[in-house]
Amino acid sequence: MKILVIGSGGREHALAWKIAQSARVSEVLVAPGNAGTATEAKCRNVAIKVDDLDGLLALAQREAVALTVVGPEVPLVLGVVDRFHAAGLRIFGPTAKAAQLEGSKAFAKDFLARHGIPTAYYAVHTEVDAALAYVREKGAPIVVKADGLAAGKGVIVAMTLGEAEDAVRDMLSGNAFGDAGARVVIEEFLDGEEASFISMVDGTHALPMATSQDHKRVGDGDTGPNTGGMGAYSPAPVVTPEVHARVMREVVEPTVQGMIADGVPFTGFLYAGLMIDAHGAPKVIEFNVRFGDPETQPVMLRLQSDLVDLVEAAIDGTLDAAQAQWDPRPSLGVVIAAKPYPETPVTGEVITGLDAVPASAKVFHAGTALNAEGQVISAGGRVLCVAALGDSVLDAQRTAYAGLQPIQWASAFQRSDIGWRAIARERDAQA
C-alpha cells in the first residue's frame, strides 16, 4: 500500500521513517518533504505545498494512496480531512471544526471551561484598554497568547506588568503576529513542570502515546524567547503512573467525550500540553491537533508497533482493541537550528558531516532542502534533530550529542542541556 504524509518538518520525517518500516507499505509519498525524506528508504517527495488542498487531493487520487497522515496544523485547520472524506479517501486527522481546538485558543479555553477540564483562569480580549485593565487587575507573572495559529510562538510569558502590557499592545495593534493576534487570551501563569501528552483518538476511544517533554526556550537553562521547540525526550518522568491515570481520567477522556457532546467528534493525534503541579494535578496549557515537533522524533524512536496498524485502527474506530508497544529505554532528540532563530534564520548554507553521524544516532531533517548540486542546505529555523536511545536519559543525551558532533554549517547552533530536568532526577534517585 502507498501512504501519503503531508508536511515538511522533522515530525513528518519521523512519521514517514516509521511508516516506511511497515512491511505492508510499498512507498511513502511526502508532500512536500525535505532533504531527509528525499533520501529515506521507501520515501519519495512530491512538491505540493501543505495548504494546496486541491493538489494534495489530486495527488492521493492519481497515486491511489491507501491512507494519508497529516503532520502540520495548517492543512487541518483549512479542512484537508473534510476534503479527503468528501472524496471517499482514508485520512487520519481532525475535521476543520474539530481542529479549532488548536486553531483558536479562545475556542479551546471555552471548551475546557464548558466541560470542566482543568486549566488556568483566562479572559479573551479584542480591545487594548480592556485587556490592559484585566492585566493590571491580575498582576504579573501572567501569560498573553495570540488567539490564532502562530507556529507555536504566539505566547508571551510576562514576568513583569510592563512585559504584559507591551505584549497586549503588540498583539492587539496587529504588529506582532498578523491576523492571529486580533484577539488575545490572557491567562494565569501556572507553576509546575510541563509535559507533552499525546494520544491517538478514533472519535470515541483514546490510545495514549509515550509521554515526552519539550524545551521551548531557545537558550540553555530555559532562557531567551520561546521557539517551536529546541529538543525533547521521552518518557517524561514527571508523568508517573498515578499522574498518567489522572491525565487520562481528567483531561483526555473528558476531551474526547466533550467533542462528541458538542457534535464535533475528534479523530487524529490529540496533543495536550500540560502543567503538572507539585501534587501531580494536571492542567491543560494548550491543545494541539497533531503530533508535536520535536517530540515526534524521540517518541517514534521508541515506538515498536506498526504505526500503520495503529492509524488504521484509529480510522476504523477500533483503537480500544489496539495496543502500542514501546522500547522501555528513554530517547532524546536535540534540535540544531540556524542563527538567529527564532528570529528570521540564515538559510541556504551547505550542511556537511551528515554521512559521518554514527549509527547509534538518527538524524531527522526539518528545515532542509537539496540544492542544484544535490547538497543538503539549510532552509528553515529548526534544521535538524539528532535523536538517540539510551539506558538512561543521560546515556541517550550523550549519544545524541555525540551524534551531532560531525554536523556543521556556518549558522548552526543548539542547546547543550536538552534533558537536564530528567537527568537531575536520575542523579537525585541515585544519591
Curated annotation (Swiss-Prot):
Domain ATP-grasp residue range list: 109-316
Organism of this sequence: Xanthomonas campestris pv. campestris (strain ATCC 33913 / DSM 3586 / NCPPB 528 / LMG 568 / P 25)
Pathway given in the UniProt record: Purine metabolism; IMP biosynthesis via de novo pathway; N(1)-(5-phospho-D-ribosyl)glycinamide from 5-phospho-alpha-D-ribose 1-diphosphate: step 2/2
Coiled coil: none
Cofactor section: Mg(2+); Mn(2+)
One Gene Ontology molecular-function label: phosphoribosylamine-glycine ligase activity
One example of a Gene Ontology biological process annotation: purine nucleobase biosynthetic process
Cofactor binding note from Swiss-Prot or TrEMBL: Binds 1 Mg(2+) or Mn(2+) ion per subunit.
Pfam families: GARS_A (PF01071), GARS_C (PF02843), GARS_N (PF02844)
InterPro entries registered for this protein in UniProt: ATP-grasp (IPR011761), ATP_grasp_subdomain_1 (IPR013815), PreATP-grasp_dom_sf (IPR016185), PRibGlycinamid_synth_ATP-grasp (IPR020561), PRibGlycinamide_synth (IPR000115), PRibGlycinamide_synth_C-dom (IPR020560), PRibGlycinamide_synth_C_sf (IPR037123), PRibGlycinamide_synth_CS (IPR020559)
Enzyme Commission (EC) number: 6.3.4.13
SUPFAM superfamilies assigned: Glutathione synthetase ATP-binding domain-like (SSF56059), PreATP-grasp domain (SSF52440), Rudiment single hybrid motif (SSF51246)
Record keyword Hydrolase present: no
Name of the molecule in the record: Phosphoribosylamine--glycine ligase
UniProt lineage: Bacteria, Pseudomonadati, Pseudomonadota, Gammaproteobacteria, Lysobacterales
Family from the record: Belongs to the GARS family.
Binding site for Mg(2+): E286, N288
Residues reported to bind ATP: 135-196
Entry annotated with the keyword Ligase: yes
Keywords: ATP-binding, Ligase, Magnesium, Manganese, Metal-binding, Nucleotide-binding, Purine biosynthesis
Membrane spanning residue stretches: none
Catalytic activity: 5-phospho-beta-D-ribosylamine + glycine + ATP = N(1)-(5-phospho-beta-D-ribosyl)glycinamide + ADP + phosphate + H(+)
